[in-house]
């Protein structure tokens, strides 16, 4: 089968002309941009105006959410912490062969639990670790000193000129994940909150 992602408009038209099926999906993009101070509002205090245009911590991000969403995220994170789960974050060449092996065990198990073979092979990840190690950030969940789950994101540097920012931007893409143990809310922590926190810090 053939799958094309992020194809140019002319390529999409060519594919359609050749009888390929087109599938439209929705994507969610998050940017580390703190809310702009309200204009014409008493809320536009000196604190608002002094805020950086980026979140500087996960708490800053939480403060930008509604009370209900903030409460839900805090509860989910607390459930994971109360279960005794901590995280290690590894990037680039700091990810050892053993770490990659553990990640793949988790990744493979998740696919097998859903009755599918994994799309990507261990050799694929070996090649990626060898040829572009700087492009990966691995989050390993541990309990009692033993790894129990992991998630992986790809990153790339984007020149400032392409984003309109002053500095080079780091862009994180998607995630792969898997777990050897079930812990309530672990998926959210490993796949969303840990990567989001990493993005804010970097």
Residue ranges and their predicted role:
Residues 1, 199:
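Hydrophobic pocket-lining residues that define ligand/cofactor binding sites across diverse proteins
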Residues 2-185:
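A conserved beta-strand-loop-helix scaffold within acyl/acetyltransferase catalytic domains
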Residues 183-197:
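Conserved acetyl-CoA-binding loop-helix of GNAT-fold acetyltransferases
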């Amino acid at each position: 089968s053939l799958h094309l992602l992020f194809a140019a408009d002319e390529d999409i038209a060519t594919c359609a002309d050749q009888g390929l099926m087109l599938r439209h999906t929705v994507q969610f993009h998050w940017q580390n941009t703190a809310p702009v101070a309200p204009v014409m509002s008493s809320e536009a205090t000196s604190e608002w105006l002094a805020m950086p245009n980026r979140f500087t911590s996960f708490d800053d991000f939480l403060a930008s959410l509604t009370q209900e969403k903030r409460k839900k995220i805090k509860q989910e994170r607390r459930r994971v912490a109360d279960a005794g789960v901590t995280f290690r974050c590894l990037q680039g060449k700091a990810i050892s062969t053993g770490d990659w092996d553990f990640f793949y065990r988790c990744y493979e198990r998740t696919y097998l639990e859903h009755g599918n073979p994994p799309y990507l092979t261990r050799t694929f990840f070996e090649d990626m670790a060898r040829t572009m190690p700087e492009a990966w950030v691995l989050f390993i969940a541990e309990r009692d000193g033993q790894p129990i789950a992991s998630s992986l994101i790809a990153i790339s540097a984007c020149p400032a000129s392409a984003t309109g920012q002053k500095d080079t931007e780091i862009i994180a893409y998607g995630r792969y994940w898997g777990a050897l143990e079930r812990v309530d809310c672990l998926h959210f922590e490993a796949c969303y909150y840990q990567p989001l926190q990493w993005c804010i810090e970097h």
